[in-house]
Amino acid sequence: MKHSKLQTVLALALTFAALWGLLAWDPFRHLRDIFVNPALENAKVSSLLTDPNTQEVSDGQKPLESLRKLESSWCNVSKDRRYILTGNSQTFSVLLAPSEAPQAEADRTYPDLLLDRLNAAGANVHGYRLSAPNISYMEVLWYLNYLLVHPCLIPGEFVIQFNFETFRKTGVREGMLELLEDPDFASIIEQEVRSNAPYANTFQQAIDQYESRIAKEKGNQASSISKTGFAEARGAGNVLETKARTALDHLSLFRSRGEWKAELLDFLYLARVNLLGITPTTKRSLGGGPLTTNLSSLERIGELCRRNGIRVVFFNAPQNPNAPLYRTSADREQYQQIISRLARKFGQGYFDFENSIPGPLWGVWIDGPDPIHFGRAAHRRLADLMFEQGVISGKK
């Protein structure tokens, strides 16, 4: 018996030591450094303005708390003074151009700068950035359905970014599944599934994933309780794990495991770029299931906005002239035809900013010119253009 206990203690000690060693050494940071050019990596700005009153600050990872906070503040704002802008990471990232240097002050992206200009001009509008990296139009539809079951969140204007890459994205990310905690929203999504539209399967998969996660959590809770007939006692393994996690969470090294995961993902991306030659600048075409599903999502977005009195505004996102995303001229023509048709059918406004940012203002990062992200001056330029052209109706 003593020998068995000693083995258990020794196994736990060795496991803890191995975990501690990995966290302390952080092997993926060292592997990542093999591929990184420090001068280029510094171009990615980490100090950005964060304002939960105007931004979904989790960038799609945990939006429920953000939207509940927005709802409480927007209930005192009339619908015609509310607008939401949605898009990919271009809307919340700054990648410095070669001529730009880091600054101590937090940088602002074009949605922030646009809102500042509007209110400085007396527009008296309340804007909100509802964006996520690599967002799909299925996710934009997912968000819109949530907004529509909360009257205080319904915007008077919905500003949607067109981006060539977005038409290639699919699915609803795990972080957005928590919106299904809202029974009214869950009911609406179930109705969308029954529509048999091309995006319906994506929504069904999201529901299945959410229900599987909830069932697993409930199963873990149930399995942690030992029902002996005398009393319900917590299982020893569960108690030990809980106490160990609580103790470890007090250690700064263990709390940094989220950063370690991010470094692992960065390493995998850099390995893909450097070893396989697959980069964001790799030219691609549109087609197949992703295009069909995204188109059907945008059609549904247009229909819902029209039905609910929401003014839809589309804008074609800037592209880097030094790193075009189109594989052929036919790809560009196809894309232009798609967005023009959608804008004519559903848009109360359409603005084309594809060629609005000159090459020298774009970011350069790790593997060369970035096709989507740009620097500080470019964000100011785009915000000025959006203001001057009246993208937000409050400006007019």
Predicted regions and their residues:
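The substrate-binding groove and active-site-proximal loops of carbohydrate-active enzymes
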Residues: 282-292, 326, 367-374
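Residue-level recognition of beta-strand->loop/alpha-helix junctions
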Residues: 129-131, 316, 352-354
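Membrane-embedded segments
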Residues: 76-190
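A structural motif corresponding to the C-terminal end of an alpha-helix
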Residues: 117-123, 297-313, 341-351
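Secreted/periplasmic serine-hydrolase-like ester/acetyl group-modifying domain
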Residues: 32-36, 175-308
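Catalytic His-Asp segment of secreted/periplasmic serine-dependent ester chemistry enzymes
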Residues: 331-396
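N-terminal secretory targeting modules
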Residues: 1-82, 97
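Short, solvent-exposed loop/turn segments at secondary-structure junctions
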Residues: 93, 320-326
